[in-house]
Design a protein with these regions (language model features):
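Positively charged, low-complexity intrinsically disordered leader regions
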Residues: 1-66, 138
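Thr-Gly-centered strand-to-loop micro-motif
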Residues: 12, 133, 198
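Glycine-rich phosphate/diphosphate-binding loop of Rossmann-like nucleotide-binding domains
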Residues: 54-66, 151-203
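Generic structural signal for well-ordered alpha-helical scaffold segments
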Residues: 29-33, 147-152, 184
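A generic local structural motif
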Residues: 35-39, 91-93, 181
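Phosphate/diphosphate ligand-binding glycine-rich loop within oxidoreductases
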Residues: 42-152
Length: 203
């Protein structure tokens, strides 16, 4: 078990080793069990997570807010359009300011060829850990949830298990590239045979 997570960012799928990902999944299953049994698990009591969204979200926002509440903390939803970012607040300033206000900063910034750069710039300036709720390159938390589901359905030994990813969500290939890319990066570490199905125009 790998337990050196305190204060670390999770921006790219490969930021954590395979062993660390397995530890995260073990903790997730334990928390899922405790919630199902009604056992107390307020591990984040009095902690506040900033959730900065540049793009809309259904599942990611809902799951992060629910997760923080279930762990005894609070998730502060922040729409970028309601901030001073459009008036000049830089990524560095956001990192410095939010890093002082909050215990963690989660960001969704999917602008093509900029989102990941922005999140990393915030991380460099922040004293609080940064979580990637999706950028133009990675969608690490959705990928972890997908791996949990596959293991629950197919067992822990995923070697040579075939995982087929359909990549046809949007008219532009750039918008959803983070989802299949994260799945390919992470699931192959577990030995999966990942197949990417896509229209011929998506090259």
């Amino acid at each position: 078990m790998q337990t050196n997570f305190r204060g670390r960012d999770f921006i790219g799928d490969l930021d954590f080793t395979k062993e660390e990902v397995e530890t995260v999944l073990d903790v997730a299953w334990d928390l899922k069990r405790k919630r199902a049994l009604g056992e107390p698990h307020a591990l984040l009591r009095d902690k506040v997570l900033a959730m900065l969204f540049f793009f809309t979200s259904t599942r990611t926002r809902g799951s992060f807010e629910a997760g923080m509440a279930q762990l005894g903390g609070h998730a502060a939803f922040i729409d970028s359009e309601t901030t001073q970012i459009s008036h000049g607040d830089t990524a560095k300033e956001i990192g410095e300011i939010f890093g002082r206000y909050f215990d963690g900063i989660a960001i969704r910034q999917c602008d093509w060829q900029y989102g990941n750069q922005y999140i990393n710039e915030v991380a460099k300036a922040s004293r609080a850990p940064i979580l990637n709720m999706q950028c133009d390159v990675y969608h690490p938390f959705q990928c972890l949830a997908d791996i949990m589901t596959v293991i629950e359905k197919k067992g822990r030994d995923l070697k040579k298990k075939k995982v087929v990813v359909s990549w046809a969500y949007a008219a532009s290939y750039s918008k959803p590239i983070s989802v299949p890319q994260s799945l390919i990066l992470q699931m192959t570490r577990f030995g999966c045979d990942v197949v990417l199905a896509h229209p011929p125009e998506f090259k």
